[in-house]
Amino acid sequence: MRQLAIYGKGGIGKSTTTQNLTAGLVERGNKIMVVGCDPKADSTRLLLGGLAQKTVLDTLREEGEDVELDSILKTGYAGIRCVESGGPEPGVGCAGRGIITSINMLEQLGAYTDDLDFVFYDVLGDVVCGGFAMPIREGKAQEIYIVASGEMMALYAANNISKGIQKYAKSGGVRLGGIICNSRKVANEYELLDAFAKELGSQLIHFVPRSPSVTKAEINKKTVIEYDPTCEQANEYRELARKVEENDMFVIPKPMTQERLEQILMEHGLID
């Protein structure tokens, strides 16, 4: 069983990328579980046909400790198992703790069955606080992929996440598997992301182009592969799935200084 965490700044398209990637992996004959670790709880919406899934934390609040697995785990597209950890009530508590509670509960309830090939954690990545770092810190996820684009803030976040990975890689077995570019159609985007990934000592594992097919599929509450399996974008996600499945480049990243990051941005025309 490979356990992967997908990080990236808010709004970058992590959840969309993760769900489309898992749809590609399931086509390749893999059994998959997706654990949403974002308080927005939208990490499994496209796999469940838009059903707002009840989160682990909501279920715990309503039902107390006595929770059955089938009340927090729903089966979605092509048998993908879907869980949302959810978040605390606004203004109270820590969302990171929710992730810890959820993963512990899934373990106790026997969700991690031997037939699973992949478990994905879709994690909010602007803040690499202890709770959100939990999938890396506790050695749950061995592989991290960062979703980024050619925008400055996306790369700042990706560099910060790399610092978190570097910190926990020394004690645990966590490694960076690569950067996934979710294109924003910024000038020189491919070259910039490729240079950024190489500077970290990693790779740009795939460049996902921007496409109206993604929005159309989302409006229809489906992944692109389910909604329009023959379109070009569906093949992009299949290619991403192949590259992730066959990936053998796992590194402890070398995060860069602010100055070096800005230098790379300047070299590729993002800062004048």
Curated annotation (Swiss-Prot):
Similarity comment: family membership: Belongs to the NifH/BchL/ChlL family.
CDD domains, per the entry: NifH (cd02040)
Catalytic reactions on record: N2 + 8 reduced [2Fe-2S]-[ferredoxin] + 16 ATP + 16 H2O = H2 + 8 oxidized [2Fe-2S]-[ferredoxin] + 2 NH4(+) + 16 ADP + 16 phosphate + 6 H(+)
Species this protein is from: Clostridium pasteurianum
Quaternary organization: Homodimer.
Binding site for [4Fe-4S] cluster: C94, C129
Cofactor note: Binds 1 [4Fe-4S] cluster per dimer.
Protein name: Nitrogenase iron protein 6
Matches recorded under PROSITE patterns: NIFH_FRXC_1 (PS00746), NIFH_FRXC_2 (PS00692), NIFH_FRXC_3 (PS51026)
